[in-house]
Regions:
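Transmembrane helical core of 7TM receptor-like proteins
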Residues: 1-236
Length: 236
């Protein structure tokens, strides 16, 4: 959202929907890098919850400030070489004379449609990039939650609800992020159209990130109390 929304607002304000090739490449690069960063950060957060639930006594020893900093920095820089290389490859293609895309930001599928010739030969490099920045973090998240579920099932019934509340918000964010990304980029080609592409991209880039703060804040008792108080005032 921090990459796509500012440009959308500028376009709406100026009514100028053109963008230079350099700006388009920069927007795509930052969009891909920040997307990869979120994947790795979600994997790190899943690991943090796994340590907190499966080994609460060892959590302060495992998740030290130094380790947390290293994991955070690693999440930020891991996607840079892969996604920068992917962007350079896309913009090194030969593009046809058509330079108009029916989309509201520079995303991979609409830009690749402008390329002349067959881009299928470069599919393996794209698959490797997706595997590194999306599939690997998702597998790590599944592994963390598998261990969490196995641990919770061994807990007494009274403690299960408390343990579930520890990771429920993060699990919901993971489902929203990877679910919307899957619908946007991995749905069947027969369902592709300019209108549906824009709709799903809007869901993935703007709507889903807006829900994240709400999901995490609803785990805060003070926030819930303030929200109930506000709703009661409106009812009265």
């Amino acid at each position: 959202m921090s990459v796509t929304l500012p440009r959308i607002l500028v376009n709406l304000w100026t009514q100028d929907r053109s963008i230079s090739v350099l700006d388009c490449a920069a927007q795509m690069s930052f969009f891909l890098i920040l997307g990869a960063t979120e994947c790795f950060l979600l994997a790190v957060m899943a690991y943090d919850r796994c340590v907190a639930i499966c080994g609460p006594l060892h959590c302060p020893l495992v998740m030290t400030p130094k380790v947390c900093l290293q994991l955070a920095v690693g999440s930020w820089v891991s996607g840079i070489p892969v996604q920068t290389g992917k962007t350079c490859w896309i913009f090194s293609l030969h593009f046809c004379h058509l330079n108009e895309t029916n989309h509201f930001f520079c995303d991979n599928p609409p830009i690749l449609k402008l390329a002349c010739g067959d881009t299928f030969a470069h599919a393996p490099s794209v698959c490797v990039a997706v595997l590194l920045v999306a599939a690997v973090p998702f597998i790590l998240i599944l592994a963390s939650y598998s261990k969490i579920v196995c641990t919770i099932l061994r807990l007494p019934t009274a403690r299960r609800a408390k343990a579930f509340s520890t990771y429920s918000s993060h699990l919901l964010v993971v489902l929203l992020f990877f679910g919307s990304a899957t619908i946007t980029y991995l749905r069947p080609k027969s369902s592709y159209s300019a209108g549906t592409n824009r709709l799903f991209s809007l869901l993935y880039t703007i709507v889903t990130p807006m829900f994240n703060p709400m999901i995490y804040n609803l785990q805060n008792k003070d926030v819930i109390a303030a929200l109930i108080k506000l709703l009661l005032k409106k009812v009265v």
